[in-house]
Structure formats: structure tokens, C-alpha cells
Amino acid sequence: MAEGGRAEPEEQERGSSRPRPPSARDLQLALAELYEDEMKCKSSKPDRSTPATCRSPRTPPHRLYSGDHKYDGLHIVQPPTGKIVNELFKEAREHGAVPLNEATRSSREDKTKSFTGGGYRLGNSFYKRSEYIYGENQLQDVQVLLKLWRNGFSLDDGELRPYSDPTNAQFLESVKRGETPLELQRLVHGAQVNLDMEDHQDQEYIKPRLRFKAFSGEGQKLGSLTPEIVSTPSSPEEEDKSILNAAVLIDDSMPTTKIQIRLADGSRLVQRFNSTHRILDVRDFIVRSRPEFATTDFILVTSFPSKELTDETVTLQEADILNTVILQQLK
């Protein structure tokens, strides 16, 4: 230290070499460089491709609550649609579902347009089955087509059923386990069900176009004059056919019933009858609805247990076939 308290030049030089505290600007620059390095690191990582099963942008999962309040009860996160469909196919395969051969499908479904996507068939129901063994006639089997869309699923040509509905979720859970859903068992009255699945998860639900031709005859209307057609997708040639030219006179003052008739060509007719109508009236209705069967020898049998309706003079009530499914079999 020199006189007057002034520092020697050597001491001033040492004092000026001390590090100064970082300023706010220095901190901002450091943070900016750190952020740029992190972004470069992320961009250098290879992008993982979206699985082939996810064909639409991923949507956030729906959140459901089983309690009365949002913060009360069990919290359930519903997976996106693609995950639902993929897991359904995966678990169905694990429970014995097999790919449906296109040749087999086309030979079995003459009235269905050929589908080029994947499909799986599930086996028998989880119920205890009867010891009755069906023969080779495949008409004993009831075919149901399950179409899985982006926004829900449909059965045959039915309406869209959202995945978020608890009843629909229970239906799909049964399919996942390789079981025939209870809903289908009740529908077919114990007949064997073959369930086919089609993957349409890259499409929104498409409502099938049904074509009806009204009855053009004359007469006094007592009830339903035209049959209800449960249609399957058909070719343009088949759509041009007239299948609604039969009339069944219904007495609404008497008990009525609905009979579903599965024809030998795979199509179905549903018609309302009085319980006093006879088996012969059902046969006559089939022939008048589908004239191509007028010269064909066929029989009518119940679906389950299989029994031929030999006495066609008995009433529907006496034959115990009210609100049931009967099958047409060619001789």
C-alpha cells in the first residue's frame, strides 16, 4: 500500500482479476443456451412411427366416474377407440377366434358383398349346450356380423352403438372372452350363434341403405299388409328383386305374434301373424314373398330344438312357435 491510501499498480491489477457476480442478463443467456441444447437433443432422436392400427390422430381418453360426484367413487379412464378395437381382436384371437376365410365367407353369404378387411369368427356360447348334434345343414347356425367402427359398433344392419355405453361395453367384454353375449342368446332363442367381426375403425359408421317396395294391391287394410324385411347387404341385381308382394291380413282384435323366417338362400323375413294363423299360412307367405320358391320343395323347422313342422294345419299357437325363429330347408 502506498502513501495516501492509494493501491500500488500491482495490487490494482490483482483486484481487477477477481470474477464479478453474474448479472441478470448473464442468467438469461445461459437459460436460453440450455433450452436450445435441449431442443436440439429432442430433435436428434428418431421419431417413433405410429402403430399401423392407429389410423386416426390420437384423441384424449374419455374419463368416467362411477360415483355421484367427479371426485367421488371409482375413476375410470376409457381408452381411445383404436385401442378398444385392437384389444378386442387380440383377446378374441387368444380365446380361440380364427381368421375367416374369404372363400368360405362368400360361399356362405351369397347376399353379402365381399369384404376385403380382416375378420374373425367366434365359437359357441358360454351357456351349457344341449346334447343335440346338428347335421351338416348350416342353416341351424345363426350368423351375426359385428362391425367395429371408429365411433361405435353395429350388429348386422342395425343402428350404431357407442363404445361409451356401459351395456355395449359389457357386450364387447363377452366377445373378448370368446363368449356369445347374452343379448344374442336371447335373440336366437337358444340356437347356435356364429359371430363374425369386421374391422372398420378407420371409418365412421355407415348406415346401410334399405330398399322397400310398398304393396300396390287393393283392399281393405285390417293390419300390417307388408312383411318387415331384415335385410343384409345385397348386390345390385338382388336389390332389384321384388320381395314385398305378399299380404297377410291381420285381425288386430285377436292376439298377434312376430315370426322370423330364415330362408335357404340366407335372407330373412319377419312378419306379423295372428296366433290363429296356420303353418300353411306361413308357407303361403314365403312363396308369395319369394316366388322363386313356388316350384321348390322345402320344409319348415324350428330353430332349437330342431323339429320339422309336418302338420301344416295346426295354428301357430298350437305349434308353440309364437315369437320364434323358424328355418326353411330345401329337400
UniProtKB/Swiss-Prot annotation:
Keyword set, alphabetical order: Acetylation, Cytoplasm, Cytoskeleton, Endoplasmic reticulum, Golgi apparatus, Nucleus, Phosphoprotein
GO CC annotations, alphabetized: cytosol; endoplasmic reticulum; Golgi apparatus; nucleus; spindle pole centrosome
Pfam family, one: SEP
Chief localisation class: nucleus
Residues where N-acetylalanine is found: A2
Cited SMART domains: SEP (SM00553), UBX (SM00166)
Modified residues (Phosphoserine): S56, S66, S231, S234, S235
One GO term (biological process): positive regulation of mitotic centrosome separation
Phosphothreonine modifications at: T59
Region (Disordered): 1-70
Residue ranges with Basic and acidic residues bias: 1-16, 37-48
Domain named SEP: residues: 141-206
Subunit structure: Interacts with VCP. Does not bind ubiquitin.
Matching PANTHER family: UBX DOMAIN CONTAINING PROTEIN, UBX DOMAIN-CONTAINING PROTEIN 2B
Role according to the record: Adapter protein required for Golgi and endoplasmic reticulum biogenesis. Involved in Golgi and endoplasmic reticulum maintenance during interphase and in their reassembly at the end of mitosis. The complex formed with VCP has membrane fusion activity; membrane fusion activity requires USO1-GOLGA2 tethering and BET1L. VCPIP1 is also required, but not its deubiquitinating activity. Together with NSFL1C/p47, regulates the centrosomal levels of kinase AURKA/Aurora A during mitotic progression by promoting AURKA removal from centrosomes in prophase.
Protein name, per record: UBX domain-containing protein 2B
Source organism: Mus musculus (Mouse)
